[in-house]
């Protein structure tokens, strides 16, 4: 923790094609070893596949997918009197988006399709239709929070 107060958040620039900061953040999540060009190519090709398969604007499909992935509640471990409790807490909007993007990319990477473009496109389409591994992760997170509702009074 810095002594001079909170560290200022570094803002990302909107991407050149869709003019969206969310897309830039997704590119940053996809990026491996600093290869931004490769990450951009993967994302833009995935968006083209989404456009072909759904017939809708890829940004709308992506926004819907992200809405379906972002968690509202999560559990946080809290130590009380020698035992750990999983305390349900509300997820802040910034973290909600971050978790949604992280889960989308991670579960796209685990899929079986041949190229990352196909994996990402299919995961976005699945998430937009309330299916897929990323949506399941959100459901599991919510179930954990629901199951531990009894410990909600330990919140801090």
Swiss-Prot record:
CDD domains: uS7_Bacteria (cd14869). Gene3D superfamilies: Ribosomal protein S7 domain. GO terms for molecular function: rRNA binding; structural constituent of ribosome; tRNA binding. InterPro entries: Ribosomal_uS7 (IPR000235), Ribosomal_uS7_bac/org-type (IPR005717), Ribosomal_uS7_CS (IPR020606), Ribosomal_uS7_dom (IPR023798), Ribosomal_uS7_dom_sf (IPR036823). It comes from the Bacteria. One of the primary rRNA binding proteins, it binds directly to 16S rRNA where it nucleates assembly of the head domain of the 30S subunit. Is located at the subunit interface close to the decoding center, probably blocks exit of the E-site tRNA. This is Small ribosomal subunit protein uS7. It comes from Shouchella clausii (strain KSM-K16) (Alkalihalobacillus clausii).
């Amino acid at each position: 923790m810095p002594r001079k107060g909170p560290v200022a958040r570094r803002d990302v620039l909107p991407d050149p094609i869709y003019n969206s900061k969310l897309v830039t953040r997704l590119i940053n999540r996809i990026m491996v070893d600093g290869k931004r060009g490769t990450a951009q190519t993967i994302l833009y090709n995935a968006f083209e596949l989404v456009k072909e398969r759904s017939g809708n604007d890829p940004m709308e499909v992506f926004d819907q997918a992200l809405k379906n992935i972002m968690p509202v509640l999560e559990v946080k471990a809290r130590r009380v009197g020698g035992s750990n409790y999983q305390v349900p807490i509300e997820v802040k909007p910034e973290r909600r988006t971050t978790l949604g993007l992280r889960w989308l990319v991670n579960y796209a990477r685990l899929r079986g399709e041949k190229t990352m473009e196909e994996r990402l496109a299919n995961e976005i389409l699945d998430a937009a239709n309330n299916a897929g591994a990323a949506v399941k992760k959100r459901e599991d997170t919510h179930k954990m929070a629901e199951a531990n509702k009894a410990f909600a009074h330990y919140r801090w």
